[in-house]
């Protein structure tokens, strides 16, 4: 938020002032400095507030309906001290955004050549959308600034032994303060589109209740800068930064209350920004239910609700409620709000092949896809969960009512896949039938094994950083996956977008100087190979791929691995927050020229 922006609301320095404003006046919240941008009307029933938990008189336990500085202070007290970075106010774009200042590689070593010679002269359709992606918690920093409430990841990162390198998202790249410079640099580099996420606990510090006025001003200005720069905006509403207040109250994704709370957040954000956003992703990788619930909710980290303490039952109630929350937003967006853009959610999945020619290994691949993509893709394309999932889980899997099936089916406008890697799948000892009926089997409920090593003993492609053992550079796998998803798994989909793909250069964080890290040859090779195979899928295989998003805009907080694993197309110096484009950035950009 620009320091010069003034509030049209009266603000008391030590208390929270709540005002209900008629919907026709809501755009005035940011119009004073809008430079001709007009934001959408706020639906009836929303209130606004400013928050400053550091002005709390005395932090104390609060009721779920209390939205005060005191209550917010209690939430932040769960974390302990928050680290401040070197920048703590919005910075204007400077000369570093001048494209002429970007050093490029190639003096004595050229770029990576094309992999698929048959498509060297082929072109993608003019309507193909491409750009770079990032997420709020991973890049914004400013963890407790300007009224933001803590997210579950704020808490997890502040708990020892959760993040491998004991770093947090408190500061990271400080995009919250440096967004003007970042957007100017994207424009100078020639990046046509950006796919960030917005932060739920910034807009709603308690997950619901009054909207944080300062968050609105901030994101208003982010959108304004994007429009001014001519960069298309494609926004994810949820990228894992669940408001901690909702976890404290009812466990979030284990209680149906979360559907209405997410809808309340999504409705406000979409209503305000839809005219400037081309695509809404309700959720980033709802498969997060599969792996994050091995960590939470768990009694030593977070409260436990409804007898869910992690593991398989929690995974699938989370998956079920996430689907319903998505569908409720999508139905409103299409039928009532009649939005201008497209809406879907981003899936996490990788291409799998049988580890051998055996029938057991073939079934292992199918089960792998059923339990990752099928749980989420089946209901919106075919109207229900995969049969193998239902048979294995029985009563553990919540049943979709006919009304819910009708709401979910067709709720996505296209299939979005975050496709990074590939693997082989194999039958577990004893076979799938024995595993299916034995919940104590370590492989249950998926009842298959996975490896990145092929049957010939070779790894399927050059490996990524040692801290992301699942990641290999296997570009042909992505091409086959795009064919498999659209022609075999979900033939009803009209088009598919690769919403994330990227690579963690091995040992990149170990260099004592920045300059060696900038020549990230394996990452450059990765992007060349993956883009070549996306193009081949389009022009040679007839797959309707309509977009691709490189991950990531720059180095960021990589969840359980922290800051020491780097996925960025730009190098971030976490001491002074300077960003420098890597060789992979130019490999990526030059491919589209």
What are these regions (language model features)?
Residues 141-219:
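Active-site-adjacent substrate/metal-binding segments within catalytic domains
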Residues 31-127, 131-157, 206-207, 220-593:
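Active-site region of glycoside hydrolase catalytic domains
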Residues 3-12:
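Bacterial N-terminal signal peptides that target proteins for export
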Residues 2-3, 16-42:
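N-terminal signal peptide
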